[in-house]
């Protein structure tokens, strides 16, 4: 297959996956499964703002990727009857970029900035007055002819999403009146999400088939929906189209997703810690180089779940594998080896 043909097929597949993700995305708080505390509080805040005829206060959504931050931003826009404008931290490189976005907002609009922790400090400073006073100051010309022009903005709602809240500066965090942190989902909630997605995709699933996908989805709806789509492929090719527990187990094993929901990279991280670094501690950069992945990806995508589930921990000295990791891969821990040595 030619490179151009391969690239074209990949682009088409990416578009298809994006279309499916949009199709599966809940459109209202009632459709949104899980994160009950966030939903309850947000419902109150939105109703109060609507009753007062005001825009909703600025909202910060933080937590690991794939838990529904972007989805909730769109739901807020739907519930508030607002137009949503979307961007991301890496795209807004210069003051002119953010100024262009802000000056095109209309009253009541919702501006969603994903990966807001990746905004440059210069761009971030423009947001301070925009969020607090609904105005920005733009410098016209250069040198002795330079002058500042103040532009008033209509009231709007900023929704920022981040996987690394700690990287946000204190002044920016302080300008968000509503601050929510996402938790990982339970297997039962993910089963509910999986069954809802299956109905939308017109895929037959048994309850235990949906649960098998759910419990091996790293507590993450995005992962559950992705595994559902891939399991559907196995059900159609190797079965009668219905996702049963047996089909789900077959598909997930073929995708290198083990009984604990760990994928190939999870295993590489933990086994590298155990085998190459004697369980740790070792630094993030050393670990990233050893497994061939970006340190930021390890820290944002993989480590939160492994830490949450007790496979590893972060210490001041570095990353350390915990006993559950040794047990999972049937390895003997240094502590167990020492106990055995002491008994001899």
UniProtKB/Swiss-Prot annotation:
It holds the Pfam family RuvB_C. InterPro entries: AAA+_ATPase (IPR003593), AAA_lid_4 (IPR041445), DNA_helicase_Holl-junc_RuvB (IPR004605), P-loop_NTPase (IPR027417), RuvB-like_N (IPR008824), RuvB_C (IPR008823), WH-like_DNA-bd_sf (IPR036388), WH_DNA-bd_sf (IPR036390). Its EC number is 3.6.4.-. It catalyses: ATP + H2O = ADP + phosphate + H(+). GO terms for biological process: DNA recombination; DNA repair. Residues 186-256 are annotated as: Small ATPAse domain (RuvB-S). Its main location: cytoplasm. Mg(2+) binds at residue 70. Keywords: ATP-binding, Cytoplasm, DNA damage, DNA recombination, DNA repair, DNA-binding, Hydrolase, Nucleotide-binding. It is found in: Cytoplasm. SMART domains: AAA. ATP binds at residues 24-25, 66, 69-71, 132-134, 175, 185, 222. DNA binds at residues 314, 319. GO terms for molecular function: ATP binding; ATP hydrolysis activity; four-way junction DNA binding; four-way junction helicase activity. PANTHER family: HOLLIDAY JUNCTION BRANCH MIGRATION COMPLEX SUBUNIT RUVB (PTHR42848:SF1), PTHR42848. Homohexamer. Forms an RuvA(8)-RuvB(12)-Holliday junction (HJ) complex. HJ DNA is sandwiched between 2 RuvA tetramers; dsDNA enters through RuvA and exits via RuvB. An RuvB hexamer assembles on each DNA strand where it exits the tetramer. Each RuvB hexamer is contacted by two RuvA subunits (via domain III) on 2 adjacent RuvB subunits; this complex drives branch migration. In the full resolvosome a probable DNA-RuvA(4)-RuvB(12)-RuvC(2) complex forms which resolves the HJ. The RuvA-RuvB-RuvC complex processes Holliday junction (HJ) DNA during genetic recombination and DNA repair, while the RuvA-RuvB complex plays an important role in the rescue of blocked DNA replication forks via replication fork reversal (RFR). RuvA specifically binds to HJ cruciform DNA, conferring on it an open structure. The RuvB hexamer acts as an ATP-dependent pump, pulling dsDNA into and through the RuvAB complex. RuvB forms 2 homohexamers on either side of HJ DNA bound by 1 or 2 RuvA tetramers; 4 subunits per hexamer contact DNA at a time. This is Holliday junction branch migration complex subunit RuvB. It comes from Salinibacter ruber (strain DSM 13855 / M31). The lineage of its organism: Bacteria, Pseudomonadati, Rhodothermota, Rhodothermia, Rhodothermales. The gene is ruvB.
């Amino acid at each position: 297959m030619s490179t151009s043909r391969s690239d074209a097929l990949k682009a088409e597949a990416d578009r298809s996956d994006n279309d499916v993700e949009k199709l599966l995305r809940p459109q209202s708080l009632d459709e949104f499964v899980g994160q009950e505390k966030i939903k309850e509080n947000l419902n109150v805040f939105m109703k109060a703002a609507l009753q007062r005829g005001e825009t909703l206060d600025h909202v910060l959504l933080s937590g690991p990727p794939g838990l529904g931050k972007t989805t909730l931003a769109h739901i807020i826009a739907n519930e508030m009857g607002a137009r949503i404008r979307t961007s991301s931290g890496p795209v807004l490189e210069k003051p002119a970029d953010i100024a262009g976005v802000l000056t095109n907002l209309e009253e009541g609009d919702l501006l969603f900035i994903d990966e807001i922790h990746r905004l440059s400090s210069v761009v971030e400073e423009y947001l301070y007055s925009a969020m607090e006073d609904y105005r920005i100051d733009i410098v016209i010309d250069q040198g002795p002819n330079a002058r500042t022009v103040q532009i008033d903005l209509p009231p709007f709602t900023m929704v920022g999403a981040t996987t690394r809240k700690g990287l946000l500066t204190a002044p920016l965090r302080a300008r968000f009146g509503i601050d929510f942190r996402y938790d990982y989902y339970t297997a039962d909630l993910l089963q509910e999400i999986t069954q809802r997605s299956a109905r939308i995709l017109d895929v037959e699933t048994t309850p235990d088939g949906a649960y098998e996908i759910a419990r091996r989805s790293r507590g993450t709806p995005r992962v559950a929906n992705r595994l559902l789509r891939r399991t559907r492929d196995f059900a159609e090719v190797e079965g009668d189209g219905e996702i049963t527990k047996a089909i789900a187990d077959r598909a997930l094993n073929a995708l290198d997703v083990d009984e604990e929901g760990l994928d190939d990279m999870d295993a590489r991280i933990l086994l590298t810690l155990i085998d190459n670094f004697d369980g740790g501690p070792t630094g993030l950069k050393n670990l990233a180089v050893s497994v061939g992945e970006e340190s930021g990806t390890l820290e944002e995508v993989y480590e939160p779940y492994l830490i949450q589930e007790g496979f590893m921990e972060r210490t001041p000295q570095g990353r350390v594998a915990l006993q559950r990791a040794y047990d999972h891969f049937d390895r003997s821990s240094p502590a167990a080896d020492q106990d055995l040595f002491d008994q001899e």
